[in-house]
Amino acid sequence: MDALRSTEAKAAIGTRPTYDLSLVYLSGGKETPIANLNGHTISVRLPYTPAKGEQTGNLYAVYVDDAGKVEWITKSSYNASLKAVVFETSHFSVYGVGYKTFVPAFTDITGHWAADNILFAASRGLLSGTSDTTFSPDTGMTRGMFVTALGRLAGINPDSYQTGKFTDVKADAYYAPYVNWAAQTGIVEGVTATTFAPDTNINREQMAVIMKNYAAKLGYDLPQTLKAVTFADNTQISSWAKDAVKSMQQAGILAGKNENKFDPKGTATRAEVATVLRRFVEIVIDPQAANGWQQNDSGQWNYYRNGESVKGWLSEEQKWYWLDKVTGMMFAGGWKQIDGKWYYFYADGTMAVNTVSDR
């Protein structure tokens, strides 16, 4: 694969794996190459184990053409449960695992539960920081910025959407073409017939509705990978949002928060939106990305198997974890009494082996 010898390909991929993908069908013992998918796409997993120090939000699938030019695939992501970089393609050629360091680095996301998801959204140009070095992960996401992120993910041409119907969306605002696009496409309707409230924070049930509309209008069929959950605050979800919340939860794109609450009227934070964008990309490529280890929208870990939250003891890769018998949330960082015996769990949730306690 001479193309991989280019300076650009070496800089993007380094020593990470590369694959020359092809598709064939077998008939009568004879292999026939399939060169054209006729406008359809196929989901691909590139197996990969991140190197020490690599942040998974910065991992991409990259396409290398015959001249050695690299295309970074925005709609690709590393999924830890699948242990692979996932993406969709409509053609077969040379692909590899690339790494793009986001510069400048955000100084306010270190240790944040959504740090990798924030890097995913920022490195792909879906979300910007609130300054050159800050992301403000726990502040609210405005409606204008949210729709802008969706437009960027869809890859629209802003020049094609310079006029719109909302009187409170100024033509020179950065979000104007994206709001116009979303309205013309039927993804958003506005808070009234003529206003959008672009600078107002979006709440979680509004986010669910817009995401469901986005998927439908762009032709994505949302899977029902996870078992439906009845949230503790289900009665607080507006009637017009209930179906969207259920669809997003079952697909694995939106999750609850602590105490099994959805918090429908709560403001969607910038960290939550970054997380939703990453989940969406992974889920529409490979619905099974919703199984395995998953964080809820407060950053707590659960483990899903065949669409259901595992509860009690979990053995995974020769390590033991304790998942609450009611909520399924992983216990981490300290002593825990289980069935009359004491166990110690590290900060990553793994049980300390050979633990002896005289409590």
Predicted regions mapped to residue ranges:
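Short, surface-exposed beta-strand/turn "edge" patches of beta-sheet domains
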Residues: 67-91, 261-262, 333
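Extracellular adhesion/carbohydrate-binding repeat motifs centered on closely spaced tryptophans
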Residues: 78, 82, 285-359
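Short, ordered beta-strand-loop transition motifs
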Residues: 11-17, 26-28, 76-84, 130-131, ...
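Proteolytic processing hotspots in large secreted/extracellular or virion-associated proteins
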Residues: 1-67
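Feature responds to low-complexity, polar/acidic, surface-exposed segments characteristic
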Residues: 90-115, 123, 128-144, 151-177, ...
